[in-house]
Amino acid sequence: MATIRACRPDDLDALHEICLKTSDNGADGTRLYQDPRIIGEIYAAPYAILEPAHAFVAEDADGVAGYILGAPDTRAFEARCEAEWWPTLRQRYADTADVPSWKRTRDQWDAFHIHHPPPVPQPVVDAAPAHLHIDLLPRLQGRGVGKALMDRWLATVGGRAHLGCQAANPRAQRFYERYGWRRLEGVGPKSVVWMTFGA
């Protein structure tokens, strides 16, 4: 069984690996990227570094294989990333705004995100200001670890939050719905399913 514990600075490489290996709608996205760390620089590392009180990992005998990361105030987190996180990455990754969207690779889409991070839609933040990201490697899936991580994290924000799930990832949507998350209909692009808990 996995142990749930607070994230530590030395977990950062594991967070990057997990983020990459779940980046293809829950499956291993390694083949989709030239830079294996770029996606983690968006969806994992900033939370571990800027919001350590809201970062937890699941660790088994083979190491860290899951995480839940987030922020209690989405707008404050977006502002902090703009001030403290994105500037350094913008020096490392060139803006790809000049590449037509239909031609962009995964790396180019993520570089575009770094330069033009989309704010969470206001109706989502109004429903629940906190947000999270949760990912588990296959060896921890279906064993109650996701629920344990969710329980631990939601307790840190008073049990109210939102998340965005890829519409092409029905397995994740089923997990959230079983836990008690509800869909917010008619918000944002159809490629993302916005969900809230406790709202």
Specify the residue positions occupied by each region the protein language model found.
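A short beta-loop-alpha structural element at the N-terminal edge
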Residues: 3-17
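Conserved acyl-donor/pantetheine-binding loop and adjacent beta-alpha core of acyl/acetyltransferases
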Residues: 75-133
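Conserved GNAT acetyl-CoA-binding A-motif
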Residues: 128-130, 157-167
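Conserved beta-strand in the GNAT
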Residues: 57, 63-72
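Conserved glycine-rich acetyl-CoA-binding loop
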Residues: 125-127, 134-151, 167-174, 178
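Active-site rim helix/loop that mediates acceptor-substrate recognition in acyltransferases
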Residues: 32-55, 61
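Conserved catalytic-core motifs of GNAT/GCN5-like acyltransferases
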Residues: 74-75, 164, 177-196
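Conserved GNAT-fold acetyl-CoA-binding loop/helix
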Residues: 23-43, 79-94, 98
